[in-house]
Amino acid sequence: MHTPNPDPNAPPALSPEEYRDAIAREKRLGAVLKTPTPLTKILVVTNVLIWVVAFFWGDTLGIRTPYFNNAQLVLFSGMKVNELVAAGEWWRLVSSQFVHLDVMHIAFNAYGLYVLGPMVERFYGWKRFLTLYLASGTAGALASYYFVSAPSGGASGAIYGLVGVLLVFGVKYRHELPKRVSKALTMGMLPWVAFSIGIGFLDSLPMDNGAHLGGLFS
């Protein structure tokens, strides 16, 4: 009987212990992924509702941005305005996380929160997720305050903070997670971060890289 030669490029077979460990990891991950994520849904809905209210409040159409066409709305909407923050309105470093400039801005951030939020909420629980979200968003707004003079707002800083959390989680628990998940949480995130930061340097796009980087490294 002819026995075929093994493929030298084939990955080594798992031992029984390694196989059982891999199955156990998949089961643990499956249980975690079934956990409900109510806070993520609440945050997405809250951000969208605030944008809808601001949109009609500013009486805008198309791609016009109410905050840059209506000085009163800049003052009352909760945006990060450096002069007002310096005058003592530090609450804007928190409120600005929930204020978005146009439909593309809210759509991009709502989608990012919808994708990344459930993972962080499931891995850390809703209380720590809320703390991480607000802390990252505030750190992003603070970085924007020091490095970007223009008024700004949005959940981008908080979302980049979630990216940072998942990167750290993927590295820290790389031996406990299935390899495909660990790789997705680390190497899979880097191209997206590089692309998002890169387009932020384009003059044609009003993106606040100060908030993005502040949230990411918080």
Please describe what each predicted stretch is.
Residues 2-218:
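A detector for small-residue-rich transmembrane helices and their helix-helix packing motifs
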